Amino acid sequence: MFHMSTIETDGFISDQAVEGRAIFRDRFSDIFALAEDMNRVAVLKIGEAKLADIDNGLFILFLLTIRIIESYEAIIILMERGMLAPAKLIIRPLLEAMFTLAALVKDKDLITKYFDAQDITRQIQPRSA
């Protein structure tokens, strides 16, 4: 016998919360349709990229684009479940990645500076035991 888990016992990973997805999608159908259309375009574009065509300097642009798409999809998934606060937490790093990507596209010399900054950050962070 199947026992449907409830929000009271299993929170947002419950069967009941999954069923609530239809309610949110119906209530905000225009927004979800637009979000999915935008996501579809982004996924198709990134799918057209060929790793063999990406030289080392531009590889970071490819990776940042993937990170942006994944963050965008995470926001959609969280919003479907009515998890507004966690979705909002992802917006800032998504925007930071978008601004970084735009800056790197405009000035390819920033790619080297970006890697240098990442190296410095790793050196400063305390190492776990």
Stretches with model-predicted labels:
Residues 2-64, 69:
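N-terminal, Lys/Arg-enriched amphipathic/low-complexity engagement segments
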Residues 44-59, 70, 77-129:
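Short non-catalytic regulatory patches outside canonical folded cores
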